[in-house]
UniProtKB/Swiss-Prot annotation:
GO terms for molecular function: protein-L-isoaspartate (D-aspartate) O-methyltransferase activity. Catalyzes the methyl esterification of L-isoaspartyl residues in peptides and proteins that result from spontaneous decomposition of normal L-aspartyl and L-asparaginyl residues. It plays a role in the repair and/or degradation of damaged proteins. GO terms for biological process: methylation; protein modification process; protein repair. PANTHER family: PROTEIN-L-ISOASPARTATE O-METHYLTRANSFERASE, PROTEIN-L-ISOASPARTATE(D-ASPARTATE) O-METHYLTRANSFERASE. It catalyses: [protein]-L-isoaspartate + S-adenosyl-L-methionine = [protein]-L-isoaspartate alpha-methyl ester + S-adenosyl-L-homocysteine. It comes from Desulfovibrio desulfuricans (strain ATCC 27774 / DSM 6949 / MB). The gene is pcm. This is Protein-L-isoaspartate O-methyltransferase. The active site is at S62. InterPro entries: PCMT, SAM-dependent_MTases_sf. Belongs to the methyltransferase superfamily. L-isoaspartyl/D-aspartyl protein methyltransferase family. Its EC number is 2.1.1.77. It is found in: Cytoplasm.
Amino acid sequence: MVDPKRLRRRMVREQLEARGINDAEVLAAMSAVPRHLFVQEALRAQAYEDTPLPIGYGQTISQPYVVALMSQLLEVRRGMRVLEIGTGSGYQAAVLATMGCTVFTVERLRELYQDTGNLLRQLGLRGVHMQRRDGTLGMPEAAPFDRIIVTAGGPEVPRPLTDQLDEGGILLIPVGPRPRAQRLMRFRKEQGRMTGEDLGPAIFVDLVGDHGW
């Protein structure tokens, strides 16, 4: 495998900056996080290509551009508390933690919870707190959150998540009907009300749970 640092620099230049990702903190984090460690060993040669990859158990790691875009759309600042629904490979959580956020992340699949938890610990990402549970219920004991990011698509915005979003916060979630055809929505909470913005079409795995599919 070519030097991962060189591949990351090329990924940032050709896949992210060339497509409008201009948040310096996002670009720095994407340059630093070793994406090849978050994919299956047999697929590591493809880790820095702009494509999603299977991670087992019917799940995928999003393409680098999507991770960067969602990180930029969250408008995070260092020190923010971020709730992530759908840990998956752990790559998105690692990027946000590298940006200086405290990340609370939820995974429902036991195997991914174990595998990803082990990897995050090996990488020394102490700013990531992971639990296994129904993500559509959020993490009420750690609320409120400055930002909430949902990495799976559901039929509607789960009410527990809006309740756990702090005033002035942002919630980013794919919403729409099956099969995996959603709209990426960004909601802002102002004076207790949620105002939504349609950011365009999106394709994500299904959000499974009491308030999902």
